[in-house]
Structures are given as structure tokens and as C-alpha cells.
A protein has these predicted regions:
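Non-catalytic terminal accessory segments
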Residues: 3, 324-484
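Hydrophobic h-region of N-terminal signal peptides that target proteins for export
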Residues: 9-17
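N-terminal active-site segment of His-dependent metallophosphoesterases
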Residues: 19-89
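Active-site-proximal beta-strand elements of phosphoester/diester hydrolases
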Residues: 21-33, 171-185, 228, 286-293, ...
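Divalent metal-coordination and catalytic microenvironments
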Residues: 28, 77, 82, 95, ...
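Active-site environment of divalent metal-dependent phosphoester hydrolases
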Residues: 32-35, 85-87, 115-123, 182-185, ...
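His/acidic metal-ligating clusters that form di-metal
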Residues: 69, 73-76, 108, 173-175, ...
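Extended active-site neighborhood of metal-dependent phosphoesterases/phosphodiesterases
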Residues: 94-216, 283-284, 304, 312-313
Length: 484
């Protein structure tokens, strides 16, 4: 008890010395150097059309937002990874040149790499109808390029990763956590037999130990600690770590507990291109994760964070236009909408696994009553897929936009959309079960499948973490204030 009181008094003293600190947080800026488009044509057009990101506008978006940040005059700018489209050297050099504009105005900048940024075989030039390999960078080169933005001076660096601990403002320690697996990437351009690339994240054991040591040391000196990582630490909706395992850091519950125990109560992340704020607990203590969407993907969010005493306050900003496109927001929304149906194919693949389990369960029940018809899923796959897309494509597109915008539960369309999606899923499940059961199908689905789907959908579209449990929590995604 006395130790906690002493730490609290020291922290208060440090906070009073530093005063309020203003931070701008961005993530997944995915900038592409304009030099990579040697000649506009089918190659870049096809690539850009297949993506939710506004790739062709990315450089102008970054320039525009940097200008707005200079007007705001924050103390620090923090960017939680995926600085480039695909790790192109030219794109990194462009990003660094834009960050120099901030440094020239006395604004501290801290970055960490994302999964796209290092040793990426997808680095390309675009020339009319052709694409060809562009130079990517190594981990050492990343450190060199961003030596003024977290990787130089008196910053403490982890020897096992690109993690670091910096004190950009007296009394505030920022721990940049490298959660990437780019060391495992293979590139033909470097003599490997194949190109491989890793989206998923993990923190090495030695790195986690180093991080917690840095946090404990800072706390013992009465300093505030904020962490920054590319991958999610907390599930922002139920079962995120199962459904989107590449977007939540491996062993996330253990990492969460270790960070909380070390005194880390706030972390900035990105990766999923979703602006969402979530909170989780361990032994009555908490950590709040502020995930910020991609700067070049609708709704084009970035954040202002104010740290005052022991409180962190978050405000969300939206870029609506750029000089070359006054309709950026509307065009960006259409870009997301056109990409959703393709993404749903991976959802359908997972759903087919659920349907197979449901069908086996039903077959077991039927066997107790003398057997009966069992659905040949392979033969019915096309029918199920057609029903899935007919029932859910439009609804899922609306849901996707709602998720990206944040504060889903406050959206007046949320309740209606939940009901419609439940009805659509029920129709898909019904199409997958033996027709000979007639009215029994609906009752079986309602009892055995829909509670799980309903909880999942409500967690996502009502913005509820640990939905329906005593640990359920809802945090405002756009404007939040909390102790840390």
C-alpha cells in the first residue's frame, strides 16, 4: 500500500512538472511515393481499384494532414506502423521527408514499423500496363531512415527487435513495441527461392521482458507510460483473436497481463484500419487500447490525444477532402463498399466450417430417431454460397462501413441492421440443412446456432467487448477520457 502511494505521489509530481501534453496519433498511413508510378495506366489503376485504401491519393493525403498537424502544434506525433504501401525504399524516403516538416517546427515524431514496412516483396513500380520489383528495406535501414523519429539520440533500444523506449517530453515515456515478423519474410530479390510475407504479429519473449522492465523503471521514477504497437493487443469485438487472428498479437492475453502488471495502462495501435477504443482488465486493473484507422481509408481518421495529470482524452478528426479531390470522403466510402463482397468469401469459408459442424450435430440427433437425410455439403456448396451473397452482401457492406466509422452502437441503424443480419444468417443456415425436416429446421437453428451468431453480431455492431458477460464494456470510439 505504501509503495503504491509513493508511486502515485511521484507520478503526480512529474505530471505537474510537465503539464498537459498534446499528441497526434495516426496509423496505417500506407504512403506510396509518386515516383513509383513511372507511367499511369492499367497496372496502377487495377491495383488501386482492388483495394479499400486510396492508394493513388496517399501521398497527397499525407502532405495535407502534415499541414493540418503543423497548424495544431502538438508536442508529439505518434504513428503506429504501416508507414508505406509495401515497404518501398522510395516510399519510406518520402514519409521521412514529410516527417521532417514536423521536426522543423519543433514537433517530436515517433514511429514504429508495421507488417508492410520491411522486407516486403510486394514493393513494386507501376509503368503503364506493367509492374516490376522495387527496392524494399531491411530492419537496419528502417532504423537509419527514421533515426530522428524514434531510433536515434538517447532513445533506449531493444537488441532483439525494433522496440524502443523514448522520453519525448519530460515525464512521459513512450514504449514503441515491434510486433512484426518481417525477419521471417523471404524475397527472391535477395536470393530466396520464394517470396513470403507475414501479416500476423508476435512479441518475442526477450522483447516482452525488455518492455516490462522499461515500463517498471519509468513508473518507479514517477513517469507516465504510453505504449504503441501495430497489432491489436485487445480484442475489439468478441472472438477477434479467432476470427481475425492475424490482427491480434499472438498470446495477447498474456501480453496484456504483463503490460498491465508493469504499469502500462494505455496503448495506441492500428493494423485493422478500424477506429475503435477498447478496454480490458486483469486483477482489477485495466489497459485501454486506442486503435486508429488507416489515414488513407474511409473514414480517414486521425486522433488528438491530450494527457493531463492522470487522464488521457481522445478526440477524433476526419479528413474530408484534399486539393485534387473535394469529394474524397464520398469516393473513399465507395472504395470500401466495392471491396467488401470479395472479403466476404473468406467469411463464407469460415461459415462453411460452422455449417458442417451444425449438420453433423443434426445428423447425430436424427440418428437417435432412426436416421434421416444428411446434407451433402460439397454438392450444395454453390447453393449455400449463392444464398450467402444474396442475403448478406449488402448488409455486410453497411456493417463494414459502420465498423470503420466507429461508435456502432450509437448509430440509429445499428439495431435494425443486427436484426437483418440475424435473419440473413438464419436463411443461409436453413439453406444448408436437410429440407425434409421442414419447420423443424428453424427451431433447430434458433436453439443451436443463432445465440452464438447474435452475440457476435451485437458485439460488433453495438461496440460491446465481452458482450453479455459481467466484464462487458463499451467505450466511446471517437471522444473518450479515461485514467491511465
Amino acid at each position: 500500500m505504501m509503495r503504491k502511494l509513493l508511486l502515485a505521489l511521484l507520478a503526480m509530481a512529474a505530471m505537474q512538472m510537465s503539464g498537459a501534453i498534446k499528441i497526434v496519433a495516426m496509423s496505417d498511413i500506407h504512403a506510396m511515393s509518386e515516383m513509383l508510378v513511372e507511367k499511369s495506366g492499367a497496372a496502377i489503376d487495377k491495383y488501386a481499384a482492388s483495394d479499400m485504401r486510396m492508394i493513388k491519393e496517399s501521398a497527397e493525403i499525407l502532405r495535407t494532414v502534415i499541414g493540418k498537424i503543423i497548424e495544431q502544434r502538438p508536442d508529439i506525433v505518434m504513428i503506429s506502423g504501416d508507414l508505406t504501401k509495401d515497404g518501398e525504399r522510395l516510399s519510406h524516403e518520402f514519409v521521412a521527408s514529410q516527417l521532417e516538416r514536423l521536426r522543423a517546427k519543433g514537433i517530436k515524431v515517433l514511429v514504429i514499423p508495421g507488417n508492410h514496412d520491411i522486407s516486403n516483396a510486394n514493393a513494386k513500380y507501376f509503368n503503364d500496363k506493367e509492374r516490376r520489383t522495387a527496392a524494399t528495406i531491411t530492419r537496419k535501414e528502417f532504423r537509419d531512415i527514421y533515426s530522428h523519429f524514434g531510433y536515434g539520440g538517447d532513445v533506449k533500444c531493444d537488441t532483439a527487435s525494433l522496440s524502443y523506449a523514448a522520453e519525448p517530453v519530460k515525464g512521459l515515456v513512450v514504449i514503441g513495441i515491434d510486433s512484426n515478423r518481417d525477419e521471417e519474410n523471404l524475397l527472391k530479390a535477395r536470393g530466396d527461392s520464394v517470396n513470403t510475407y507475414h501479416t500476423a504479429g508476435r512479441i518475442k519473449d526477450a522483447t516482452l521482458q525488455w518492455i516490462t522492465n522499461q515500463a517498471r523503471s519509468a513508473r518507479a521514477q514517477g513517469k507516465r507510460v504510453v505504449a504503441m504497437m501495430h497489432h491489436h493487443l485487445i480484442e475489439h469485438f468478441d472472438k477477434e483473436a479467432q476470427l481475425l487472428d492475424k490482427y491480434v498479437v499472438a498470446d495477447h492475453e498474456n501480453v496484456r497481463n504483463e503490460l498491465i502488471d508493469a504499469g502500462v495502462h494505455a496503448i495506441l495501435t492500428g493494423h485493422l484500419h478500424l477506429s475503435d477504443i477498447a478496454r480490458d482488465y486483469n486483477n482489477g486493473d485495466s489497459i485501454t487500447e486506442v486503435a486508429t484507422g488507416s489515414l488513407i481509408t474511409c473514414p480517414f481518421h486521425y486522433r488528438t490525444i491530450t494527457i493531463d495529470a492522470d487522464r488521457m482524452s481522445v478526440t477524433t478528426h476526419q479528413l474530408k477532402s484534399i486539393a485534387s479531390n473535394p469529394h474524397l470522403l464520398a469516393d473513399g466510402k465507395r472504395q470500401v463498399e466495392q471491396a467488401v463482397p470479395g472479403l466476404l468469401n473468406s467469411v463464407l469459408s469460415r461459415l462453411m466450417g460452422k455449417i458442417e459442424k451444425l449438420n453433423k450435430k443434426l445428423s447425430g440427433v436424427m440418428a437417435l430417431f432412426g436416421g434421416g437425410e444428411s446434407l451433402d455439403l460439397a454438392a450444395q456448396k454453390d447453393k449455400i454460397a449463392a444464398t450467402f451473397h444474396r442475403e448478406l452482401d449488402d448488409l455486410a457492406t453497411k456493417a463494414f462501413i459502420m465498423l470503420y466509422e466507429g461508435n456502432e452502437g450509437q448509430n440509429p441503424q445499428s439495431k435494425v441492421l443486427i436484426e437483418q443480419m440475424n435473419a440473413g444468417i438464419k436463411a443461409v443456415l436453413a439453406s444448408s440443412l436437410p429440407a425434409s425436416l421442414g419447420d423443424m429446421v428453424e427451431g433447430f437453428i434458433t436453439e443451436n446456432a443463432m445465440p452464438m451468431f447474435d452475440t457476435q453480431i451485437r458485439s460488433m455492431l453495438e461496440d460491446r467487448n465481452h458482450c453479455g458477460t459481467p466484464q462487458e464494456v463499451v467505450v466511446d470510439d471517437h471522444t473518450a477520457s479515461f485514467k491511465f
